[in-house]
């Protein structure tokens, strides 16, 4: 069970994470992540009615909550994550969800680590393009 301090509840937090975060999709879920240095790691879940009825949605959330707990233990500060369950998650077993979440986490963390380099690349490209036009 996630501690209350790690639960994301505000709509603004969900919006910020899903709109400006790194994203990684898998068969059963989509993971959005933003680095939040100095803040407690917060986790939010989006499980829509397309996943199934209330019982199925809650079962899916419980599984995902249990699977993300080790990440929160390892990284108690510095991240904001939103996990959106896709309809296939309702029929996925625990191992499939675990593999998808681990894979998505690895991918997103890799993207976040590469983000500063990517942010510098367009500037360098724009500078070289501008210089090329002057000749």
Model feature map: region roles:
Residues 1-135:
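Positively charged, solvent-exposed patches that mediate nucleic-acid binding
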């Amino acid at each position: 069970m996630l501690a209350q301090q790690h639960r994301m509840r505000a709509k603004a937090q969900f919006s910020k994470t899903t709109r400006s975060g790194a994203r990684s999709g898998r068969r059963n879920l989509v993971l959005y992540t933003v680095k939040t240095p100095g803040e407690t790691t917060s986790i939010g879940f989006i499980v829509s009615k397309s996943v199934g009825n209330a019982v199925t949605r809650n079962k899916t959330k419980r599984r995902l909550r249990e699977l993300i707990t080790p990440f929160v233990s390892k990284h108690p500060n510095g991240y904001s994550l939103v996990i959106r369950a896709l309809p296939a998650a309702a029929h996925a077993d625990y191992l499939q969800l675990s593999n998808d979440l681990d894979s998505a986490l690895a991918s997103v963390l890799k993207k976040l680590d590469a983000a500063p380099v990517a942010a510098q690349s367009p500037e360098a490209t724009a500078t070289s393009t501008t210089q090329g036009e002057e000749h």
